Amino acid sequence: MRTPITNVNWLEHHEIMDELLYHEASLTTHPMDDGFEAEVLKINLDQESYVLKTWSKSSKPDVQFQYRLLDVLSERGVAVSKPVGWGINPDGNKVLLTSFDGTPIHKVNNKTMKELASILARIHQIDIAELEHIQLPKYDFIDYFFPEVREHTDLNQAVISLVEQTPMRQDRIIHGDFHLGNIVEEQQRFTVIDWTNGQLGDPRYDFAWSFILLKIHISERYADMFRSAYLLDNFMEQEELEVFEAWACLRWILLNRRGSTPKGPNVSKRVKSILGSNRFLKDLDFQGFK
């Protein structure tokens, strides 16, 4: 029986790939929920499971970089999936095979928030000198996280105002989209997945994005627990916190206007509350969000 891994031109892989190909007749596959960017398939062999991501949609990230990044992070004990291999399938789409590390988090508590904050803090503490051989990408902050913002006059004016008040750093590895949807759990062990946005960036923004998403979509109480736990490991001044929370809120509004944010009860109310309490945003007039 031929499987989705059979006809792939595997450009880099670990030894376990040879075993999977040797036992391909025994492999079973099960579809998983696709993300915005890729098709996702679970592959099983005996008691072991793996995840195959195929970038068949419009997004075409650097999969080789993801593979190598996961390799060095997993070697250092960071809570990421172990990469098995990456390559190109017969349709010309890039694929990545990794370990299967659990299912999405459905319930959170104080302990969960503290552990996730500790994981993110540890990622931000990695010495990038150890990762030089994988050439971490560095992008223009506005172009990357605020694409097409110039088409929104109100947001663009706010961005221009914040740029003047934010000495931006790009000296740490960041995940770029650290939230509950990109974390899985198995037997109380958390794993950070989807490193499409991994890059050299400002850890203060990376943290603020996670914090704002928790505040908007989960609860202020759990968001504050996450913040307190993170700041124990990576201290930030109050003004830094506020300015990067402003950046994160502006990005949320931009994504919301593009239809890329989850809907839920009280979401608009929470966003308005954040805008009203942030000194960098409270006097600005926004045209609304869905």
Model-derived segments and spans:
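Active-site acidic catalytic loop and adjacent metal/ATP-binding pocket
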Residues: E39-N44, V51, I160-Y205
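An alpha-helical support segment within catalytic cores of ATP-dependent transferases
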Residues: T6-H23, I128-G176, L180-E186, L275-K290
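A conserved alpha-helical element in kinase catalytic cores
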Residues: S49-L96, P104-Q125
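Active-site activation/catalytic loop segments of kinase-like enzymes and analogous catalytic loops
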Residues: R204-M236, A248-K263
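Conserved hydrophobic "DFG−1" position in protein kinase catalytic cores
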Residues: K42-I43, T54, G85, S99-F100, ...
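Short, polar/flexible loop-turn hinges at active-site or ligand-entry regions and domain interfaces
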Residues: T103-N110, E130-L131, H217
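ATP-binding glycine-rich phosphate-binding loop
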Residues: Y22-L45
